[in-house]
């Protein structure tokens, strides 16, 4: 087992639904530690840059529009197998396919407004974390 970090974004729909505390509770109960967090209002440039790998996909403009529709809570989570653990807690991208008890099954309304984002690999996690946080903003949890 590896101690890892992953990026998590609580998206505008879940922030608007006052689900931050419930989502953080699930992270912590699964053994993930929050080592950085900030509430942000993304603009088109920041959201577009983050999702640049999807720029040619048909859903890109709608995704950027959604991600700029309200504040998001961007966090770095740390723990044993954090990437896989976080993805398991999130559930399938489409909430209709998400397992009962996952974040998306419980808080997402559609495949477009699906409550959370999580890194899908160690490489993505490193890139995504550095996109939103500098090293001084990520605090080691030793206690």
Swiss-Prot record:
InterPro entries, per database record: NDK-like_dom (IPR034907), NDK-like_dom_sf (IPR036850), Nucleoside_diP_kinase (IPR001564)
Cofactor(s) needed by this chain: Mg(2+)
PANTHER family referenced in this protein's UniProt entry, alphabetically: NUCLEOSIDE DIPHOSPHATE KINASE, NUCLEOSIDE DIPHOSPHATE KINASE DDB_G0292928-RELATED
Top EC class, one word: transferase
Family from the record: Belongs to the NDK family.
Catalytic activity: a 2'-deoxyribonucleoside 5'-diphosphate + ATP = a 2'-deoxyribonucleoside 5'-triphosphate + ADP; a ribonucleoside 5'-diphosphate + ATP = a ribonucleoside 5'-triphosphate + ADP
Protein name: Nucleoside diphosphate kinase
Described purpose of this protein according to its UniProt entry: Major role in the synthesis of nucleoside triphosphates other than ATP. The ATP gamma phosphate is transferred to the NDP beta phosphate via a ping-pong mechanism, using a phosphorylated active-site intermediate.
Gene: ndk
């Amino acid at each position: 087992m590896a101690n890892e970090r992953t990026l998590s974004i609580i998206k505008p729909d879940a922030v608007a639904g006052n689900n931050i505390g419930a989502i953080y509770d699930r992270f912590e109960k699964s053994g993930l530690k929050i080592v950085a967090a900030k509430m942000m209002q993304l603009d088109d440039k920041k959201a577009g840059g983050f999702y640049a790998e999807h720029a040619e996909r048909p859903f890109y403009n709608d995704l950027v529009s959604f991600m700029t529709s309200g504040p998001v809570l961007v966090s770095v989570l740390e723990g044993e197998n954090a990437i896989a653990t976080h993805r398991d807690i999130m559930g399938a991208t489409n909430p209709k396919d998400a397992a009962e008890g996952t974040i998306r099954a419980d808080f997402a309304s559609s495949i477009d407004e699906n409550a959370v984002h999580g890194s899908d690999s160690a490489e993505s996690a490193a890139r995504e974390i550095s996109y939103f946080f500098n090293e001084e903003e990520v605090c080691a949890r030793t206690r």
